[in-house]
Regions:
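Short loop/turn hinge sites at secondary-structure boundaries
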Residues: 39, 46-49, 129
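Short, contiguous strand/loop micro-motifs
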Residues: 76-78
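Conserved alpha/beta-domain cores
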Residues: 2-27, 34, 49-65, 70, ...
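Long alpha-helical scaffolds
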Residues: 98-99, 119
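Short amphipathic alpha-helical patches
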Residues: 44-52, 116-117
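Active-site-surrounding "flap" and adjacent substrate/cofactor-binding loops of secreted or lumenal enzymes
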Residues: 113, 117-130
């Protein structure tokens, strides 16, 4: 009998992706756990009638906080979002005239292993401009090159991923981000040249 903890799920991450992910996981997991514990404490306090407020003296409340948005992300008046695991919808989203596109890896999909990995593959292929979809009639749709900015939305901080590495749970959000970031490294390098 095979120990289930040693069984690799289908579509397992490559050793290279794991080599990229695991140092990030080990670095950020303690902080993530602290944030999740703080979130639970805040929830308990809110349930007891003590609602949260802003930190006094915070730059966010005194009007001095500013964020510089790069030129390529300035025009975000209209952004389209949808499920990253659905190639047909993602191709359609990428082919709109909207300045922004957000493949959603959490709320728009069921976060089981096949859907999560499909979301990774589709998002990577969309960024690379190679994502296609062929319907039942044999008609193929592909991404038309454009200037649309893509913002991938990973799963939330509170969601774990148990299939990335046998016997070890990692942050779902960090795994999603690492998979897409790692899978599009060549495109990002080319963009800065």
């Amino acid at each position: 009998m095979t120990d289930i903890m040693e069984t690799r799920p289908p579509d397992s991450p490559s050793p290279e992706l794991l080599e990229f992910l695991l140092p990030l996981h080990r670095s950020f997991e303690p902080r993530r756990r602290l944030l999740l514990e703080a979130r639970l404490r805040s929830l308990r306090e809110a349930e007891a009638g003590r609602l949260p407020g802003y930190l006094s003296g915070s730059e966010a409340t005194d009007g001095t906080w500013r964020l510089s948005v790069p030129d390529w992300a300035q025009d975000q008046r209209n952004q389209i979002t949808g499920p990253a695991d659905n190639a047909k919808l993602l191709v359609a989203m990428c082919n709109t005239k909207d300045p922004g596109c957000m493949p959603d890896g959490e709320d728009s999909i069921t976060c089981d292993w096949p859907n999560v990995r499909a979301a990774h593959r589709n998002t990577i292929a969309a960024i690379q401009g190679t994502l296609t979809f062929t319907d039942a009639a044999g008609k193929t749709a592909k991404i038309v090159p454009g200037k649309q900015v893509m913002f991938y939305r990973p799963r939330g901080l509170h969601l774990d991923e148990m299939n990335a590495r046998p016997g070890e749970t990692v942050s779902g959000s960090l795994f999603d981000l690492a998979a897409v970031f790692f899978g599009t490294a060549a495109e990002r390098r080319a963009a800065v040249k």
